[in-house]
Amino acid sequence: DFRRGKPSNHKKFGEANAILAGDALLNEAYAICFEQSAKGDRYLLASRFLNECAGVYGMIAGQSADLYFSEKGGELSADDLFYIYEHKTGKLLLAPVAVASILAGNKCYLAFENFGRLLGKLFQMTDDILDVTGSNEELGKTAGKDEKENKLTCIKLYGLEGARMRADMCARDCYGVLEGIEGDVSFLRDLVDYVLRRSN
């Protein structure tokens, strides 16, 4: 019901208007992609990649799986969890990293793609951890919501300490990918540090 300490869109303006706002933003994003695609092949490839990350094979698939497993209950596996991670948050954070690499013509595109996927996984792990350890005030949203909604999380599968250990391992994997990329990646390294240690 809250995001960043303020009422969520659907709480402030109603569910119908919130859905319409989402539709409007998606359509505006596609309009921008079409316009930019006229600039050449790299822009066309970047637009296509962004569409795949957001669409039925990306973020929407992950969100749908998240809802499905919450309703299904029963025994769930690490494969189920990491499918959600990779498609829901993974694609969301993968997209800007990989798209920027495509537009820049960077030869390390696949490494950037791998980094973005790992960063999304790390972000979702820390999100699961904060849902258990944080307060409403710290998070700017309702704490403890995952358990109430029967969400499949790394806490549910591994416990708090196990989840923290896996988050640390994932951060090390992120650093490892960055070591293989030429050029200044200090911003991305700082981003990993922030995601691992964030409090909201």
Located regions from the model:
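Mg2+-dependent prenyl diphosphate-binding active-site environment of isoprenoid biosynthetic enzymes
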Residues: 1-178, 184-196
